[in-house]
């Protein structure tokens, strides 16, 4: 019979009890996990894409309406740009804390955990169920899921600018392209504002302010815009440095120019005070609206960006919406 005494073990090179080990095991105290579980209870039901179009895998959608459509139509709540997905493929139905899934007579069916569900028949979802829509695979996470809460934080970090909290450039450009395509299909207006901070380099170069002062201005500017100007359907992103973009879906050039002027005036009137020093801040704005001649988001952005530089050449602290 083999016993423990038949084995020889080398003693560990360094024990947890050695005072100068430098990497002692930390004894866990407190209720960190309890706090995480308590926070997760506030997390609504979600679906996350496991397999699908590039750029969308890992994306999380919150189920925050009583009914949500998954489909290839730009009007879908969960838009999936994949030819295997019908325009209106699947419906998610939420009642209280229970979520049901229903196939909308799609061409390629809706499959839950390897079983195709009958059309127009709601099927109750359980936590971690997998939903296949055409060739696209989602995972359902029920309310209070720790995994969904963690994924939500990861997604937010990947989409947001770490300094200001505005959406980052990658997310901005993706949203712009999606919004442009959607506006063309639905035949609705779409405008954008491109703006940057006037003489921002002087703020960074000021010995009393330096880069911390510049960072403060960027954060305060975004906070001011988000709390005073951004509507629920608007989208604010940081393009880079001190340059930002607002996407105004459904706004024509006149409406966008008015919003641009309100934006300019709000920033001019706002008091930016850093460590007791008042910093005068103004912005220059370029405005553009999608025209029938434009075929890409990049064309729309280029027009607004050109008008931004017209505002700067013409004296700064102004809005340019034509030319």
Residue ranges and their predicted role:
Residues 57-134:
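Forkhead-associated
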Residues 154-174, 195-211, 219:
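Conserved nucleotide-binding and Mg2+-coordinating catalytic segments in signaling enzymes
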């Amino acid at each position: 019979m083999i016993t423990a005494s038949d084995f020889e073990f080398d003693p560990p090179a360094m024990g947890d009890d050695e005072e100068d080990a430098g990497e002692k095991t930390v004894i866990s105290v407190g209720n960190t996990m309890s706090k995480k579980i308590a926070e997760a209870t506030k997390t609504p039901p979600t679906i996350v894409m496991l397999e699908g179009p590039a750029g969308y895998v890992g994306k999380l959608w919150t189920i925050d309406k009583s009914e949500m459509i998954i489909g290839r139509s730009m009007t879908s709540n969960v838009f999936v740009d994949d030819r295997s997905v019908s325009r209106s493929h699947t419906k998610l139905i939420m009642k209280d804390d229970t979520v049901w899934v229903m196939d909308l007579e799609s061409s390629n069916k809706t499959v839950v955990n390897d079983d195709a569900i009958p059309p127009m028949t709601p099927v109750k979802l359980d936590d971690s169920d997998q939903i296949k829509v055409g060739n696209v695979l989602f995972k359902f996470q029920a309310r209070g899921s720790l995994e969904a809460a963690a994924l939500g934080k990861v997604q937010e970090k990947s989409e947001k600018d770490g300094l200001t909290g505005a959406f980052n450039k990658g997310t901005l450009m993706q949203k712009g392209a999606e919004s442009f395509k959607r506006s063309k299909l639905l035949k609705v207006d779409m405008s954008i504002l491109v703006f940057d901070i006037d003489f921002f380099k002087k703020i960074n170069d000021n010995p009393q302010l330096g880069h911390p002062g510049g960072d403060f201005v960027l954060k305060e500017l975004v906070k001011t815009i988000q709390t005073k100007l951004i509507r629920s359907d608007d989208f604010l992103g940081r393009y880079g440095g001190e340059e930002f973009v607002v996407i105004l879906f459904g706004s024509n050039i006149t409406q966008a120019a008015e919003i641009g002027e309100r934006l300019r005036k709000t920033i001019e009137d706002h008091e930016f005070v850093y460590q007791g020093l008042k910093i005068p801040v103004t912005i220059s704005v370029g405005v553009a609206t999608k025209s029938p001649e434009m075929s890409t988001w990049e064309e729309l952005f280029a027009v607004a960006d050109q008008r931004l530089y017209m505002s700067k050449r013409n004296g700064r602290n102004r809005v340019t919406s034509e030319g």
